[in-house]
């Protein structure tokens, strides 16, 4: 996964829908940056943190 991935790439990586990724961004569970009016990129570090088991 690239350092900054598209919403579709992130959804494919996590095995969820793009709607779920957008909800994670809105809830603050994933960090994302807007690079233009329609271009959103998700930070790889936040995806890895989301996948990290609790207590590890």
Swiss-Prot record:
Q: Name one Pfam family in it.
A: HTH_17
Ordered alphabetically, the record's keywords are: DNA recombination, DNA-binding, Viral genome excision
Does the keyword DNA-binding belong to this entry? Answer: yes
User: Domain of life here?
Assistant: Viruses
Q: Which GO terms describe its biological process?
A: DNA recombination; provirus excision
Q: Does the keyword Ion transport apply?
A: no
- InterPro entries from the UniProt entry: DNA-bd_dom_put_sf (IPR009061), HTH_17 (IPR041657), SinI_DNA-bd (IPR010093)
A GO molecular function term, named singly, is:
DNA binding
Relate the protein's function as given in its record: Excisionase and integrase are necessary for the excision of prophage from the host genome by site-specific recombination at the att site.
- Similarity remark: Belongs to the L5likevirus excisionase protein family.
Q: What protein is this chain from?
A: Excisionase
Q: Which organism is it from?
A: Mycobacterium phage D29
């Amino acid at each position: 996964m690239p350092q900054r991935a598209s919403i579709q790439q992130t959804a494919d990586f996590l095995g969820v829908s793009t709607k779920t990724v957008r909800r994670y961004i809105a809830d603050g569970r994933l960090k994302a940056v807007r690079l233009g009016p329609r271009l959103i990129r998700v930070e790889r570090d936040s995806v890895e943190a989301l996948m990290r088991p609790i207590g590890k």
